[in-house]
């Protein structure tokens, strides 16, 4: 996680260090969004995989799985948009490191794609 104390400002002689509050806020918000979307994708993928490993009754599966897959698709698209948005923005000249979050997001997107490909009619889900 990112903390204000992580910012190292070089103060010139006699000048107080200044922090660009908006950059810190932007980074913090972006970091939170990445963590949230990774968690949501992980949870939804686990729920979908649960139906594949331990099938419920046909009625439960027929009523729950389609809406769960639709929600997973929506979250996957949201994650992809967020990924593209973050890559396109200039975070800061302070070189904030979010590579670990990108790696986690990429792993969850791959896992989600693999999960969606297990189901028939996958062309409708991909």
Swiss-Prot record:
Cytoplasm found in the keyword field: yes
Keyword Cytoplasm: yes
Induction: By heat.
Top-level division of the source organism's lineage: Eukaryota
A GO term from the CC aspect: cytoplasm
Compartment(s): Cytoplasm
Organism: Saccharomyces cerevisiae (strain ATCC 204508 / S288c)
Any one GO BP annotation for this protein: signal transduction
Subunit structure: G proteins are composed of 3 units, alpha, beta and gamma. GPG1 interacts with the beta subunits GBP1 and GPB2.
UniProt-recorded name of the protein: Heterotrimeric G protein gamma subunit GPG1
């Amino acid at each position: 996680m990112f903390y204000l104390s992580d910012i190292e400002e070089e103060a010139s002689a006699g000048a107080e260090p200044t922090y660009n509050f908006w950059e810190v806020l932007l980074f913090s918000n972006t970091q939170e969004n990445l963590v949230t979307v990774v968690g949501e994708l992980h949870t939804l993928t686990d729920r979908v995989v649960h139906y594949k490993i331990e099938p419920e009754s046909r009625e439960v599966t027929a009523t729950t799985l389609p809406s769960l897959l639709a929600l997973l698709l929506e979250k996957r698209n949201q994650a992809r948009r967020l990924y593209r948005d973050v890559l396109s923005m200039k975070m800061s000249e302070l070189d904030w490191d979010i590579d670990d979050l990108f790696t986690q997001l990429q792993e969850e997107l791959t896992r989600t794609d693999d999960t969606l490909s297990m189901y028939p009619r996958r062309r409708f889900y991909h």
